[in-house]
Amino acid sequence: MSWAHNYRKVKVEYESEDSWEEEQVGQALGRPLDSATVDITMDPNQIQALIDNAVRQALSQQQSQFQTQLNSLAARVQSLQVEAPQIKIYEKVSVNPDVRCDIPLDIIKSVPEFSGTQDEYVAWRQSAIYAYELFKPYNGSSAHYQAVAILRNKIRGAAGALLVSHNTVLNFDAILARLDCTYSDKTSLRLLRQGLEMVRQGDLPLMQYYDEVEKKLTLVTNKIVMTHEQEGADLLNAEVRADALHAFISGLKKALRAVVFPAQPKDLPSALALAREAEASIERSMFANSYAKAVEERAHSGANGKSRFQGKPNKEEQGQDRNPHFTKRPKNNGQTNKDTQAQAPQPMEVDSSSRFRQRTEHYQNHPNESNAFKRRNSSERSTGPRRQRLNNVVQEAPKQKDPKEEYEKTAKAAVEEIDSENEYAPSDDSLNFLGGAPGCRSLNDGWLGEP
């Protein structure tokens, strides 16, 4: 097919109108077009060839770009110098006769022992470093060797077993390196400082909160001492202490913070002193308020009591007006009634033949010899009326009879018997139904009168 006489109708839709316009695209093919318009039908093979050509061009362009980037990365990698970690080898200390040192070993002997407690390691490490610095310039001398040996012998317990298991040589730096690897804090400094800034008092007492801040600060300072040189450690420690002071004030309760923050303390002990003074003043004010409130309530209740009883005459004062020699005492009616009911006499059930019988003269002159030398037990020491009341309670409780009726009945029978048996009546015509008179017998046939 010749492309010289082929045309294609392309309809272009404009945004403003719905009309269509035919556009000739033959010039895009690089062929001159005639005025005649014909329809074009393309073969699928030709369409596939066009698509393959476009894909190949795009892939070649991307491949060239990727190749350029790979070449630049390769050049950068070649320019980098990767340094492998260097392993430091420690040698055992030895004695050189040419090196002399006359410094005494007292400071080395004063270093405390270390038994493997992690909380004590940083303090022991600092004291050991301070003591060893005096002998460090005399490496090879006998004093230097003795100093390192003494420090090694100060390490005992789990820490000493650790050095033995790793076959650590007799070298101060080697000993510290091995102990640092085991007992140093592996937490990052950033996390430790973040934990210090997040401390809050909450419901903790003031001193407990201060101790918590000190613990967090100690962890941070120990980490700085372990990972930095002396000069850098001093600068970082000063910065961390300022952060700890700010965290302590910010974490206080609102009432304490309102007092401590305007004072601008310069260190933690000063801030603690201000906080304790503020806490004491708050407690005093709270106590004063509660005490004043209690006094006010007491005064108010006293005034109400006076107004309640005001205007009522006093019976005792009225009695004094009538006769000053006779006054009525206030009585507790409830308690008196209870005592009266408890002490009310109860009649005793005794045999009618032995009722109100006096002891004979023979018994008065010759008491029972069998009981003369016997010791009276607790039951015999009790008084007659009380003993009879107990017996009455035991006997009459199951019957549930009225005490008044029983008393009247017993009294009537006793009077009738006295009238019929005058020979048994006492000479003074006295009657006692409680068994307290001479000649009266109880239920257990024991005399309760005078001996």
Curated annotation (Swiss-Prot):
Keywords: Transposable element, Virion
Coiled-coil residues: none
TM helices/strands, residue ranges: none
Keyword Membrane recorded: no
Annotated region (Disordered), positions in chain: 298-407, 419-451
Compositional bias (Basic and acidic residues): 313-324, 352-364, 398-407
Compositional bias annotation for Polar residues: 332-344
Localization annotation: Virion
Name of this protein: Retrovirus-related Gag polyprotein from transposon gypsy
Source organism (scientific name): Drosophila melanogaster (Fruit fly)
